[in-house]
Amino acid sequence: LTELETIQQQKSFKVLLIGESCTDEYHYGVCERICAEAPVPVFDYLEKEIRAGMASNVRENLISFGVDVEFITNESNLLIKRRFVDTKSNQLLLREDITHPLTPIEIDKLIDCDAIVISDYSKGLLSEQVIDFICTFFPGPIFIDSKNSNLKIFKNAIVKINSDEEKKMISHPINSELIVTLGKSGAKWRDKFFASPKVDVFDVTGAGDIFLATLCYFYLSTQSLDVAISKAVYLASKSVQHMGVYKLTHEDIMEVM
């Protein structure tokens, strides 16, 4: 059997995804003149596009792989990222963040699933107590993408951070694998480096979400972190070629099968 046929014959996976979601608003227009009142460009509005971001983007990409996703998140209108983009230059001019306090979730039992994915943006949804409960009592693989610099709150997990977060890290996760993404350069894990394809980078928004979803799916499919990271690096490079958060297509996924 080919790798594709082998994966297609496997059962569909069930994943519990926990994390903060936001509404991503993209306001497109053109800037062709300078304001008379101040030396700033005038934004002539054309159109608006709304997408689901943060953990919701992880969910969309897990679904692209055929994963059955149980999702615990906040109401997306509590976090809004509003971007203003000049369509002539594809330049992001301004980002406005609207943030409301989130109520921490409470979890005292875990559903039967193949893996748990935590997309932790440190916005208040996930308490250390909930994280500790999950990491202590869930017997399967746990995939974590976190903005928290105190990584020792995570244990028995596969933890993914980016290179900026690595610089701010004040502690290591316990009994865990640590993967560091390196932007357009790829990723590193232990003493291994995974190069990314050379592509034109338009927008890095959501690339980490695709990396996380791909990492989870291919680890469950192959039980190989090597393979999963390689696939995740490749498919994350698809995201950065598009403006805004990106959902993997069937054609994208077939390229790595």
Task: For every predicted segment, state its role.
Residues L4-T6, S12-V15, T23-I118, K247-M257:
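Conserved N-terminal subdomain of the carbohydrate kinase-like
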Residues E32-A38, K81-T99, A115-H172, S185-G186:
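Conserved beta-alpha-beta core of the PfkB/ribokinase-like small-molecule kinase fold
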Residues H100, Q129-I142, S146-K155, I170-M257:
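Conserved phosphate-binding/catalytic region of the ribokinase-like
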Residues T2-Q9, G183, A187:
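Core dinuclear metal-dependent hydrolase active-site scaffold
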Residues E20-S21, Y121, I210:
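Active-site metal-binding loops of divalent metal-dependent hydrolases
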Residues L16, E70-I72, L94, F143, ...:
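Hydrophobic/aromatic beta-strand patches that form the interior of the parallel beta-sheet core
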